[in-house]
Amino acid sequence: MNIQTLLNQRIQAAMVAAGASDTAQALVRQSAKVQFGDYQANGIMGAAKALKMNPCDFAQATLDKLDLSDLAEKVEIAGPGFINIFLKNVWLSKELTQLRTSERLDVNPVDAPETVVVDYSSPNLAKEMHVGHLRSTVIGDAVVRTLEFFGHHVVRQNHVGDWGTQFGMLLAYMERLRSENATISMALSDLETFYRAAKTCFDEDEAFATRSRELVVALQSGDEECLALWDEFINISLTHCEETYKMLGVSLERQHVMPESAYNDDLANVVNELKEQGLLQESNGAQCVFMEEFANKEGEITPIIVQKTGGGFLYATTDLAAVRFRQHTLNANRVLYFVDARQSLHFQQIFTLSRKAGFVKPETQLEHMPFGTVMGSDGKPFKTRSGGVAKLSSLLEEAQERAYQLVASKNPEMDEEELRNIGRVVGIASVKYADLSKNRTSDYVFNWDSMLSFEGNTAPYLLYAYSRVASIVKRSEIDVVNLTGEISIDEPQERALAVKLCQFEEAIQQVANDGMPHFLCAYLYDLAGTFMTFYEACPILNAEDEVKHSRLQLALNTASTLKLGLSLLGIETLERM
């Protein structure tokens, strides 16, 4: 049940019946303060202005056409034309009963599912995944899980970088190791070391650099031996990625990899189509597209280069081919790109050109979902203590160890196996949640102490809240199957919890619509806090049976909502901590 959507529909219909245009919006929002009701409609003033009416008069005209008697106790006009809605306790009770009996918490799949292509993670295979890959991977995965929960057909696309001039350097180094009878798989066990060694040879050995350039040409020409070496490198690199994905608990698998090289055969076709449409212009021997939409104040245009002077193709060409593939082969209705904010201009150009060239249908949504940078305490991009790039796998291992030490110090009586498992869950959850709980578009500072804290909007706090609710239900020694009585809402803390529980769908809808998991994180944090306030004010286990059963159902609903919400974020829960 999405209360906000329901109220928007009804109030908008009443506004139209009162004389507003069909495009008038009710703009229903959750009320910031209880004295303003549970929801507030803020669209009256805009509609009244268009009608040249007094806002309060139009608000009254809207109320005359509005019937919310089935769900609202009171509907009132406030201030210059706001409409405040106070929900009925009996209606809330009925909704909570439906939540109790629904595995999906009464969230229905969408009526018209879409094919949504989601491009996320997408590391370059020349190096191991590092902290810079964290945001795209965990944010993209949370959005994918949420879209699938709503019933959309989601196509994961891990657009890994497996092509380009740097691979000639890497292949030359692999070739040298093989000639020296070194074991390549062992050398590749640390991709960072391998890459640095190859780069050193390239910078210091002219013969090696020449051989690297030759191998780039051979690779692009389809040389079998060169392709075999390249394929071995790619396979080992992807195995590293898969190990990190497994540790991180994201849903990406080998089958979701759609590398840059997959589009190679189509790149010339892309250039030819642009040429046939008269969109290309030669500039210093390169094939470029100049679009007036991207002119600066001086009228200078930053072009999209789709083919270099020597005939080589660029990232832009590959991205254009990917757009065509996602539209015409995958039949996407919507394509989401979870890529660094620094690529914003690039994607604006790609999307605009794709539409000019007819690579996508007019109704297909192409959406860049930019994100900020993970920063260190010095205000610069996060590095290791030695100043190097932080490998993601090492970071996750450290998170698990730190969480293990923290939990072990609080629970010395637990056996080692359970402590290690709790350390794993809490450690990984802490890193993911610290990222997911921040506004996607903002930078944030990576800080072990804050992310592993049991206070505030953190994973440890939410995991503890869930385990505490679960333990309350367990200690009641009542079979939850028998908890079928009416849920009573008598105390203000019961009511606050009831309203918050009924707002779950609104939170996850924002994730699906806007690609912003922090809305769900904020909701879960508010829910946990609302439950704690309820639990302190409203005894459960010591209450009379009828009250106990009612409050246990509120607790069960809370546990179910926390568990499902965290699972949509890709975070495991623990029954005990």
Swiss-Prot record:
SMART domains: Arg_tRNA_synt_N, DALR_1. One of its GO terms (cellular component) is cytoplasm. It catalyses: tRNA(Arg) + L-arginine + ATP = L-arginyl-tRNA(Arg) + AMP + diphosphate. It is found in: Cytoplasm. The keyword Nucleotide-binding applies. One of its GO terms (biological process) is arginyl-tRNA aminoacylation. Its EC number is 6.1.1.19. One of its GO terms (molecular function) is ATP binding. Keywords: Aminoacyl-tRNA synthetase, ATP-binding, Cytoplasm, Ligase, Nucleotide-binding, Protein biosynthesis. It holds the Pfam family tRNA-synt_1d. A motif ('HIGH' region) lies at residues 123-133. The keyword Cytoplasm applies. InterPro entries: aa-tRNA-synth_I_CS, Arg-tRNA-ligase, Arg-tRNA-synth_N, Arg-tRNA-synth_N_sf, ArgRS_core, DALR_anticod-bd, Rossmann-like_a/b/a_fold, tRNAsynth_Ia_anticodon-bd. Belongs to the class-I aminoacyl-tRNA synthetase family. Monomer. This is Arginine--tRNA ligase. It comes from Marinomonas sp. (strain MWYL1).
